[in-house]
Amino acid sequence: AGSGAANEQAITLAQVDNIRQITINKYGWDPLGVASTTESNQENTSLRVDYILNENHRLTYNYKSTEGDRLRASGSNSSFYFESASYFKGEKTDTSSILLVSDWSDNLVSEIYYSNKSTDTSQESPAGQNVPNFYIDDAYGMRVYLGADIYRSANELATETDFLKAKLTYYTGNHKITAGYENTTWDIYNLFVVAQDGEWEFDSLADHEARVASSFST
């Protein structure tokens, strides 16, 4: 499949603009223009702090954040997708941890470790999530898609993981005795609704302009 750009297909930029203006004037929302397949953003942040409380106790803190998104666009020789029919696939991950190591004596050491990781994944139309999905079966000889993809109109996943570990180590002669505790908890939120704001099909551009849909579903 191609990128869906107007200069790679039979449809012209003027025709794309005409469909766009019809949609704005008749339906009150902007399907945007020609989609780009190269738009992406990435941002990373990290922090580490080592702190010596005293000669027997040491604390280490780590934090890392990664956030990015990429525009996913479609297209073919017989189909044209407006930018609103593409989607941003975004993901943000925050991870933090803290470790406390304590030397209680020459023979006894304790470690307490806690970490939290949260990940939010989204798939959103550049036009926003409150726009319908339109497709026109024949507009200038092509099938044209506008608005939020029916599988991206409400698509979100959020996960959070908490991990706690406590460990006690005792050295006696040639032996090492350990005792510990570990616990992991998960919290998951998943939202998925097909065609949240409706799906309209139009047989032709004239029907689209006349607001005459051949089918409608929600």
Set out the residue ranges of the language-model regions.
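Surface-exposed beta-strand-turn/loop segments characteristic
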Residues: 1-41
